[in-house]
Amino acid sequence: MTVIRNTILIGRPIEEVFDFAVDTRNEVKWNPKVRAMTKLTDGPIGLGTRMVAKWTISGHIELECAEYERPYRWAWANGGPIAVTVTVTLSEEAGGTRLRAAFDARAHGPARLFFPVFVRIMRKDEARNMGYLKACLESGWAAQASPQP
């Protein structure tokens, strides 16, 4: 198990950060390695919502919302050869919203052989992605076209 932690202050209200970032379909707007994100379940985003994701370095991976506590906390999890749970916690601070992300990855079977390389890549990507997310939200672009239910 490896946990990668990142934190960033985003100059936007907590509800806006939560609503934009919890909806992983928005990740295509700020994460250059996301190719597609499709919602599989009906209704609004919440506990049990499922998505299918395609990143540049993976096949299609199914995600499930494992925690949902608006506007303070959520988690998305996937199984597979490298199981990942990303847990995000938000708190209000002077100047905006503090976002804390924990990327918890566990390798199974043959994936353990390349897991150290995966972790090195993800450490860099996750830190960089915090900056991309911040820029997207603070520019106001995020609010222009967020997908909802």
Task: Name every feature range the model reports, one short phrase each.
Residues 1, 56-58, 81-83:
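Glycine-centered tight beta-turn/hairpin loop motif at sheet-sheet or coil-to-beta transitions
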Residues 1-42, 149:
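Hydrophobic ligand-binding cavity/cleft-lining segments
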Residues 6-8, 61-67, 85-92, 103:
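Hydrophobic/aromatic beta-strand elements that line small-molecule binding cavities or substrate pockets
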Residues 7-11, 38, 54, 64, ...:
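Generic structural detector for well-ordered beta-strands
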Residues 14-15, 42, 66-71, 89-98:
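A short, structured loop/turn motif at beta-sheet edges
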Residues 34-39, 132-149:
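Short, highly charged C-terminal tails/helix-capping segments
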Residues 44-52, 68-76:
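Short, hydrophobic/aromatic-rich segments at coil-to-beta transitions
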Residues 77-128, 132-135, 144-146:
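Beta-strand/loop substructures that line and gate deep hydrophobic ligand-binding cavities in soluble
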